[in-house]
Amino acid sequence: MSRLQDFYKSKVAVDLQAKFGYKSVMEVPRITKITLNMGVSEAVADKKVIEHAVSDLTKIAGQKPVITKTRKAIAGFKIRENYPIGCMVTLRGQRMYEFLDRLVAIALPRVRDFRGISGRAFDGRGNYNIGVKEQIIFPEIEYDKIDALRGLNISITTSAKTDEEAKALLTAFSFPFRN
């Protein structure tokens, strides 16, 4: 079991149960999955770009991503149906907790001019989204070996019913919220 998973079971779940007055431990919100999504619009012109994005996301997540394809053709963007346009990976279980640990402890503090993450990026249902502008904040990516700076979206899905519960959960995992 990873460090954060132990921390959740021993400390966070107990604290949240006391704070929100849950009757059962199963009511306590938990992180169910983390989805990493990298949209690569440059892949329309050059097919090699998607391979670089897949290798970057594989290094970051620790598992092979799925290549996302366009659903329908859009002439204005010069894309046809089933064109590779990005890649995504869903993390659950131990890999999810290990990624969360690296994100909070190593990657986020490496962001240039970092003052904390926004507390307003919740979706109203207890899920949180973080946009990362550069993939080089992760220690697995070597600066010399990348072809271009690419951003990615990190979507943290929780079992919390409200944003307040989700924020309390992520704060317990020492997420550096600005407000």
From Swiss-Prot:
Keywords: Ribonucleoprotein, Ribosomal protein, RNA-binding, rRNA-binding, tRNA-binding. One of its GO terms (molecular function) is tRNA binding. It comes from Bordetella avium (strain 197N). InterPro entries: Ribosomal_uL5, Ribosomal_uL5_bac-type, Ribosomal_uL5_C, Ribosomal_uL5_CS, Ribosomal_uL5_dom_sf, Ribosomal_uL5_N. The gene is rplE. This is one of the proteins that bind and probably mediate the attachment of the 5S RNA into the large ribosomal subunit, where it forms part of the central protuberance. In the 70S ribosome it contacts protein S13 of the 30S subunit (bridge B1b), connecting the 2 subunits; this bridge is implicated in subunit movement. Contacts the P site tRNA; the 5S rRNA and some of its associated proteins might help stabilize positioning of ribosome-bound tRNAs. Belongs to the universal ribosomal protein uL5 family. NCBIfam families: PRK00010.1. One of its GO terms (cellular component) is ribonucleoprotein complex. Part of the 50S ribosomal subunit; part of the 5S rRNA/L5/L18/L25 subcomplex. Contacts the 5S rRNA and the P site tRNA. Forms a bridge to the 30S subunit in the 70S ribosome. Coiled coil: none annotated. GO terms for biological process: translation. This is Large ribosomal subunit protein uL5.
